[in-house]
Amino acid sequence: MQDLLIIGGGINGVGIARDAVGRGLKVTLVEKGDLASQTSSWSTKLIHGGIRYLETYEFRLVRESLKEREVIKSIAPHISKPIRFVMPHVSHLRPVWLIRIGLLLYDWLGGFITLPKSKYVNLQNDYIDNPLMENFQKGYEYSDLSIDDARLVLLNAQDAINRGAEIILNNAVKNAIRHDDYWEVELSDKKIIKTKAIINASGPFVLNILKDICKVKTNKSLRLVQGSHLIVKKLYEGEQA
């Protein structure tokens, strides 16, 4: 009898598995494909504080994100590295004072941080072979953290295994029957697992698992957060983004 069966091998699933097994629980994780084969390998590949959330006054979220960024930097320096972002000032979008206050707040909310703080830059004089248009005269630099997202998933999974978790790949959950005090879960290879609890960490497939597999009725809907990432050739030799 397992204490916990986790459905989904993305960053949430393996992170929960690592945490739970570290607390002494008997854990099995089931993934229908490979680890990080879906959303967790399609991210922005950034661990960031969410600077844009300052405009909607979500200060607690930004503070928590910045603290977690420092945690990742300290425990996984081999797969993460600081990256500087250059934010050109466009006068008709935001005034200079607003950008500066926002970045000062971004630095302050992070508390004691090891990444370089934000600063003002002259875009025409501070960079060699500046590729930006001439009408961009000034801007600001700030720091965030880039990371290998898929590798972060694999490292969490490996640590969970080392602590005693069972991770089953290329094997989907086909049925889950609720008994009085446990779940009986059937996998696609006909294997049966009994578990005290199930965590549905299947990302955009959570409602499918809930309704079709666990037979749980719900009127809840799923709001997907989607974005587009554009990859372009590097235009100059600087390290900034």
Language-model-detected regions and their locations in the chain:
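Extreme N-terminal leader/targeting segments of oxidoreductases
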Residues: 1-4, 19-23
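Beta1/beta-strand and adjacent pyrophosphate-binding region of the FAD-binding site
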Residues: 1-12, 28
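Short hydrophobic core segments
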Residues: 7, 193-203
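Glycine-rich FAD pyrophosphate-binding loop
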Residues: 21-41
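Dinucleotide-binding Rossmann-like beta1-alpha1 core, especially the glycine-rich loop
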Residues: 45-129
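Central beta-strand plus flanking loop segment that forms part of the substrate or channel wall
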Residues: 47, 218-240
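Helical element adjacent to the flavin cofactor pocket in flavoenzyme catalytic cores
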Residues: 140-189, 193-196
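Flavin (primarily FAD) binding-site architecture
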Residues: 200-215
